[in-house]
Amino acid sequence: MMIEMRLMGGEKKARESVNEYPALNEYLGIEGLPELTTAAQKLLIGPDSPAIREKRVCSFQTISGTGAVHLGGLFLARFHPQHPAVYLSSPTWANHNQVFTSAGLSLGQYPYFHPETKGLDIDGMLAGLRAAPAGSVILLHPCAHNPTGVDPTQEQWKQIAQAMRERNHFPFFDCAYQGFASGDLIRDSWAIRYFVDQGFELCIAQSFAKNFGLYGQRTGAFHFVAAPGPDAVSTTANIATQLSSLQRAEISNPPAYGAYIASRILNDPQLFAMWEDDLRTMSGRIIDMRKGLRQRLEAKGTPGKWEHITDQIGMFSFTGLTEPQVKLLKEKYHVYMVFPFSSPLAPLGS
């Protein structure tokens, strides 16, 4: 059902027009499709961002979000003078560990999920950020945290930014669900825009798998944003050269088909509006599934508190169930959950 919805409206029209492109089977450049990466910058950082206007952003099309994280990891491992460790939230997307270690980076963790409240452990997170060695790379999920579904509030993001500023940490955002979390593209990128506006030097991995339905086309982007300053433009140009050398050695040319589809939608006002409507529909359905699940659990008098199901956001929910409870669901009812007991909400029926 979810994929069928994604192929409706703007995306279906974009695919039809892209199929007629005469250059569809030609190589893209090493940096990817410029019309896509330029539009992707504006989608994440904002079309009026001083960082874009001042040419402090360089962008490369990647093999979806995983490829973007990988390219960023390689860049940090090869060219960051301090060779910092990458600190991941506890828990995080499982593949983060493999991608960064394969790039040759050491890893650390900071507290994130509070098992008792089933919400954000903001005090533990801030303490963990302040305890990390100065200049560490901090991997952050800007929206729809995977796998907990727990996001900081805007006020908490400001506290996180302050703690990172105190320790001169380097933010690395992994943005896989923009527009798919709340249905609002601007709201879902608020944390990124705030950090950029605060003058952080940072990088962003961007995936178009979920919000465009381009799973098999593997379309994404990696962005580096330089801090404002007299050398910002030359710094950005130098980093673009370094990224180009890494991209050439890894994949040479990113895939074209998904890039043309995403670019067509992002650069056509009518298709963009249709796409936004589809995002609101899909994210709204998941929000409704959360409400319905909580209502049914509470109506049946299920022991425990269940407000965390509606407080969390995105495709996954940390249920708070115990290991014996999850085992019972699996063996008796064939309900399967990802360790440690995160449940995908999209497959639920009404």
What are these regions (language model features)?
Residues 107, 171, 202, 336-337:
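Hydrophobic beta-strand scaffold residues
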Residues 12, 16-17, 21-168, 178-193, ...:
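Conserved core of the PLP fold type I
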Residues 175:
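Walker B catalytic acidic pair
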Residues 188-238:
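Active-site PLP attachment segment
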Residues 274-332:
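Conserved PLP-binding catalytic core of the aspartate aminotransferase-like
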Residues 68, 216, 258-261:
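Catalytic-loop motifs flanking and including active-site residues across diverse enzymes
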Residues 240-259, 265-294:
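Structural signature of PLP-dependent enzymes
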Residues 1-8, 345-348:
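Cationic, amphipathic, low-complexity alpha-helical segments enriched
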